[in-house]
Structure formats: C-alpha cells, structure tokens
C-alpha cells in the first residue's frame, strides 16, 4: 500500500481545466484508488487563488508558505526600448549563460538565427529550444548548456519546469509572459547557485496586445465553459439577474 504521495509543480493541479493538463483533474480518483495516502503538494509559483483551488482538488488541510526572497536577483526594466534587439545582442555578447524566452516556437528559431548573425563570435554557442524538438534533442541542448558548450538558449516556456541549471546569469523576457505563474517560472531559472544574476524585461506594450489577441483566439466558448462546470448555465445566472 502506498502511504505517501508527493505532487511536484502542483500549481498545475490548481490550474487544470478540460483540455489543458486535464489529467490533473483525475488526481482525486487516483488518490482514492491508492487508499487515500498522505499528500504533499509542492510548488514555487502558486498564487493565492491557485492554492485555494489545490486545497479544493486535493486532500490538503494545511499550507506552508516560504517567504524567501532571492536577493541575488536583479530586475532590469528595459521595456519599450527603441531597439530591444540591440540590447539583446549586448547581453548575449557577454558570453555569460543566458536564456531568452519568446512566445512561439517559430520565434525561438528565428531569433536564434538572428543572434548567430549579429553575434558571430558566439554563433556556435547559441541554440533554440522548444517543445517541438524531440526529447533526445532537447536533452542534448540541456547538456550542452550545462557543460558550457552553449552559452545562450532561445526558448519557449518549455525550458522551465524540471530544468535545474545553477549558473544562468541572464534571463531575458523578450516577449511578455502569459501570467504571473509563467513569469515566476521563467525568472526563477536565473541565479540558482546564489550568485548575482539579472532578469531583463525586454517586452513591449505591443506584446501585451499580441497576448490579448492570442488569448481571445484560444479562449473556449461559453458553452464549453458550461460543460466544464466553470460557469453556471444561463438559467442559474437568471436567478441572480432576472434580466437575463
């Protein structure tokens, strides 16, 4: 009999919806099938609403919040620069380990190619990384970055959870993250060895508009939300607002 279960990156269980990591929605049934073991859920990025949802979905009766502040991290705000690409080139040219986050696989490839041209001395040390790569290829990129063969990775959010490299000196948010949890996951890659590291904000107000359009495109229809029990049907709203 299994008596103790640990769920890492547990914020996903608090964010899970139909079609998006929906396997987490099966956790209550899985735990029941295991005989209701003691559960420890861990995460570094859960917001207060996510913690509340975790307590609802999982058999959690108490929470512990570590208020540790990583004082080795510096935040450099370069949003809305006239040329963020030039600023990015100057960061990559230092040769220090750098992760640049973008919002699409195509952008990861395109920006890596651009940087190889703009920073020729580092061209062979720049790679892209995204979930479209085979697992074996992603592993090779990770190992090359770990041993110093690569100094710069242009990546989607795929380079995040489960990747623990201690000596990343620069994390660049070239495009705007989609939320606080994603921001924390990306920023949290920097300076895990306790040494000074910099988080560079290079996104612009234009990125906010792009994100809004993307969210509008991918947002489920109201009928779908009703089937997922995320919003009540119109009949239920009518009890609150008789004009519906």
Model-derived regions, located:
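Interdomain hinge/linker at the junction between the two RecA-like core domains of SF2 helicases
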Residues: 30-33, 37-38, 45-93
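Catalytic P-loop NTPase motifs of RecA-like helicase/translocase cores
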Residues: 11-21, 48-49, 162, 180, ...
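Short, conserved loop/helix-junction motifs that constitute active-site signature segments
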Residues: 1-2, 31-35, 92, 188, ...
């Amino acid at each position: 009999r299994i008596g103790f279960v640990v769920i890492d990156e547990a914020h996903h269980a608090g964010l899970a919806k139909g079609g998006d990591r929906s396997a987490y929605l099966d956790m209550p049934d899985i735990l029941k099938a295991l005989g209701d073991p003691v559960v420890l859920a861990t995460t570094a990025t859960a917001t207060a609403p996510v913690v509340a949802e975790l307590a609802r979905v999982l058999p959690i009766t108490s929470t512990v919040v570590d208020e540790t502040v990583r004082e080795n991290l510096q935040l450099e705000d370069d949003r809305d620069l006239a040329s963020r690409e030039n600023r990015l080139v100057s960061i990559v040219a230092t040769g220090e380990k750098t992760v640049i986050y973008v919002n699409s696989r195509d952008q990861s490839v395109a920006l890596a190619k651009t940087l190889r041209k703009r920073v020729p001395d580092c061209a062979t040390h720049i790679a892209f990384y995204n979930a479209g790569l085979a697992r074996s290829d992603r592993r090779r990129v990770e190992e090359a970055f770990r041993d110093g063969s690569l100094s710069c990775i242009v990546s989607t959010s795929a380079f995040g959870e489960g990747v623990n490299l201690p000596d990343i000196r620069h994390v660049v948010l070239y495009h705007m993250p989609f939320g606080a949890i994603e921001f924390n996951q990306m920023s949290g890659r920097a300076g895990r060895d306790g040494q000074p590291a910099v988080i560079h904000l290079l996104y612009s107000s234009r990125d906010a508009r792009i994100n809004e359009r993307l969210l509008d495109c991918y947002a489920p229809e109201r009928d779908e939300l009703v089937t997922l029990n995320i919003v009540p049907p119109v009949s239920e709203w009518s009890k609150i607002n008789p004009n519906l």
